[in-house]
Design a protein with these regions (language model features):
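Cationic, low-complexity basic patches in intrinsically disordered or flexible, solvent-exposed regions
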Residues: 4
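Peripheral, non-AAA+ core regions of ATP-driven protein-machinery
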Residues: 17-279, 287, 556-579
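Basic, amphipathic alpha-helical bundle interface domains used for macromolecular binding and assembly
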Residues: 62-67, 82, 89-99, 351-352, ...
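Walker A/P-loop
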Residues: 281-320
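Walker B catalytic acidic pair
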Residues: 368-369
Length: 579
């Protein structure tokens, strides 16, 4: 056996290995799948045979169709398409390649291979994304923000993307991201980047800039546009500040001062916004549920930079970023229709797209007329509310989407809407009312911190004098600006104290950040025994009391804070029969 091995290792007189020639720029692209996606290496080989384009690497139909788009775009851009047989390899081979974002990467790989057929392995890499029109114009693609984030994690600093996606690069000031509109510009840029990489390696690792590669012959206009974009992007990045609490401006007609007769509900919304607590409001039609909840987003401060980047990535993956959108700084507010399916709310599908709960990440998911949603949809909310993420699986692959959303529910008290009203007659049978509320399971309702039972506008003035509403009687006509001030104070306190909203505190953090005074603890114990609160319900009351104290800039949880918290959790309204 050793002699046989030595014979096999002898050099053949008919084969002389060529000296390896290094290609200094590897072409990478991105396959969007779920929240993570995957980087894909694009390689091209030219060989003898009947002229054709072959593609390997588990590509879907959209990627395979890029062969014809790429061929037409190359010819219509003034380049010569190779006369040899073209083999395109997309690796890793076991990852399914999806989407039209590979067009530009494949075209540049073919053109570069046609110009330098002897090149082999590569040291440096560039991320390239874009869909090609037959004219050679480059169209926008989804997932550019996620692609740039993944490329940064793998140390790739050079990227070529469609000009329409240029705004998504603002979050990546440390990377050299070049937006292009036409295939000709992309080829000149890529040739320059490859020459820079070669010069860098020849100089022993010294980095060079775009302007130093003057011997490549790149079009001066392309170089200037790229330099201007990088400078503008750096300035835009420098102007984005992670301020403690900042609010956006909204039209005056969305002011909460316009809502009268529901003072207790307005303060409940203030506390919900300050601590990011889940809330359900139920009452007869026309009492102001939808009116108040639909403008809830005006009470929320802007996202922190870390939160904004995560939200922007999700919307980029979904293809929902409009042209020119840089970083989404306002919390998302999603209001899906009652006909939405579980897949639309939770996410999924062939490509594992994010659902409404992920699109509402770091924001609000508002389900108006919640009882009209499918039971499967309502029950599917339980796990993401607890785990603040959702795991989606498809064809042997899985992905985790963040889903830290604030849930707002609005519902009628019964099918006809008049249950509990003093001036209207409910026509529903007791069995119908019971069946109606069975749609909201106990585990789901237990995850909702604030429960508000509303009354009709005609009864509001009279009921405001009730002792049960003594906490809320002076909040009836506060403006949005006044409500924001207390929310800003509470938000700043929470960020400084624990780095997260009170609603997201776990059991250990509750013990650490929410110590109770003797009177507050005694009142909570008696209330929990009287109203049969679950362990989660007790934690909800403590977190609500912590938020009530924060809105008053209080350092300790007092008894009146706990009284208000129990009232909000028990039902702050005129109907006390639903839970």
């Amino acid at each position: 056996m050793p002699q046989l091995f030595l014979l096999r290792r002898k050099k053949s007189p008919f084969f002389t290995p060529a000296a390896p020639i290094i290609l200094y720029m590897k072409i990478m692209s991105f396959s969007p799948f779920g929240y993570e996606g995957a980087l894909v290496t694009v390689e091209v080989d030219l060989r003898r045979g009947i002229p054709a384009v072959d593609m390997v690497g588990l590509a879907d139909n959209a990627v395979r169709e890029s062969r014809e788009r790429m061929r037409a775009a190359i010819r219509n851009s003034g380049f010569e398409f190779p006369v040899e047989r073209v083999l395109i390899s997309l690796s890793p081979a076991d990852v399914k390649k999806e989407g039209a974002g590979f067009d530009l990467a494949i075209a540049l790989a073919v053109l570069h291979k046609n110009e330098h057929p002897e090149y082999g392995s590569a040291k440096d890499a560039a991320l390239i994304m874009g869909e090609l029109e037959l004219s050679g114009r480059i169209r926008a693609v989804r997932g550019v923000h996620a692609a740039l984030s993944t490329a940064r994690e793998y140390g790739i600093r050079k990227c070529i993307i469609p000009a329409e996606n240029a705004a998504e690069a603002d979050a990546f000031a440390a990377m050299n991201v070049f937006p292009v509109r036409f295939l000709t510009d992309a080829f000149e840029l890529f040739s320059t980047l490859a020459a820079e990489s070669e010069q860098k390696n020849a100089d022993g690792g010294t980095d060079c800039t775009l302007g130093e590669a003057s011997d490549v012959g790149i079009n001066a206009g392309v170089r200037n546009r790229a330099a201007e974009f990088l400078a503008a992007r750096s300035d835009a990045h420098a102007s984005i500040k992670d301020e403690p609490v900042v609010f956006s401006d909204f039209p005056a007609q969305l002011d909460y001062r316009e809502i009268s007769g529901q003072g207790f509900f307005i303060e409940a919304l203030q506390i919900a916004a300050a601590g990011r607590h889940n809330l359900i409001a139920y009452g007869p039609p026309g009492c102001g549920k939808t009116l108040a909840l639909s403008r809830f987003y005006t009470l929320l401060p802007r996202l922190t930079r870390e939160e904004a980047l995560t939200v922007t990535r999700i919307y980029s993956i979904s293809g929902l970023l409009t042209s020119g959108t840089r970083i989404l700084q306002d919390p998302p507010f999603r209001m899906p229709h009652q006909s939405s399916t579980a897949e639309g709310i939770i996410g999924g599908g062939i490509h594992c797209r994010p659902g409404e709960i992920s699109l509402a990440h770091n924001g609000v998911l508002f389900l108006d007329e919640a009882a009209d949603f499918r039971i499967s949809v309502l029950q599917a909310l339980r796990v993401p509310l607890e785990e603040v993420k959702i795991t989606l699986s498809r064809a042997g692959r899985s992905t985790d989407y963040p889903a830290r959303f604030q849930l707002l529910l609005a519902a009628n008290p019964c099918p006809c809407g008049n249950f509990g009203s003093t001036d209207k007659i409910c026509l529903c049978r007791p069995q119908a009312v019971e069946q109606y509320w069975r749609r909201f399971s106990a585990p789901l309702l237990d995850r909702i911190d604030i429960r508000v039972a509303l009354i009709g506008s005609g009864e509001a003035t009279k009921t405001q004098q009730d002792g049960a509403h003594c906490f809320f009687s002076d909040k009836q006509r506060l403006s949005t600006a006044q409500l924001r001030q207390a929310i800003a104070d509470a938000t700043a306190i929470q960020r400084k104290r624990q780095g997260k909203p009170n609603a997201l505190l776990n059991a250990a953090e509750i013990r650490q950040f929410c110590p109770l005074g003797e009177e507050a603890e005694r009142f909570l114990t008696n209330s929990a025994r009287r109203f049969a609160f679950s362990a989660r319900g007790i934690h909800s009351c403590i977190k609500l009391a912590r938020t009530c104290a924060d809105t008053e800039k209080g350092t300790h949880i007092q008894k009146h804070h706990m009284e208000k918290a129990v009232l909000l959790h028990r039902n702050a309204g005129g109907i006390h029969m639903m839970f």
